[in-house]
Amino acid sequence: MGLRTDSILKVIVPVVLILVQIPFFIAFEMKKPKPRDLMPIAVLSVIGALGRAVFAAIPSFNPNSAVVIIAGMQFGPLAGFLTGSLSALASNMLLGQGPWTLWQMTAWGMMGCFAGVFQRTGIFKHRVLLYSYGFLSGILFGWFMNLQYLIGYVYPLTMGAVIASCVASITFDLAHGISTLIFLFILERPWGKKLKRLKVKYGILDIRRE
């Protein structure tokens, strides 16, 4: 009897998620980072993780996505990815590890990475585009995590199942998107100014360009 498609996906997808992340960590290591380069990533990862734990009682409402986006904006795509990935790993040490951890590490990592990319294009000078990115990132995060549920627990995997999963999660996805928008509105300006001063003063991360 041949292997079922869902069984194959359960093996292949985690490997792919790991392979997606490895180049980011290798690229950072190849830069030969100094301790001062590690501090912003470590501190923001911990802040994001603790913020997620503090708001754990409110499903999908947390500041972690906003923190990750700010990290990417201020320190570049690579630092944004690492902050997102490590904050997911750290927060799940408090909230519980599982097969979803790799998915969250990848989703938050890419959220921070693209924030860094878009910041460099200058589009985030328009605040409405920044807040729109934050809101949509929360929605897309939820849809991405739906794939983990579908691949892990649903068979056969059909388009109907995908649509049903997205409909069922819409309340949580909206909560995530709205909370990200709110925390960006509250935190991005004051934190951005302070982080920019630190970046310029100590010449860390994005100053040396990625």
Describe the role of every protein-language-model region.
Residues A49-N64, S85-Q119:
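Interfacial aromatic-anchored transmembrane helix boundaries in multi-pass membrane proteins
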Residues P40-G48, G72, G80-T83, S87, ...:
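Alpha-helical transmembrane segments in multi-pass membrane proteins
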Residues V68, G80-G84, W100-T101, L130:
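Alpha-helical transmembrane segments and their helix-entry boundary regions
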Residues K34-D37, P77-L82, I123-V128:
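Membrane-helix interface segments
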Residues M1-I69:
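Hydrophobic transmembrane alpha-helices
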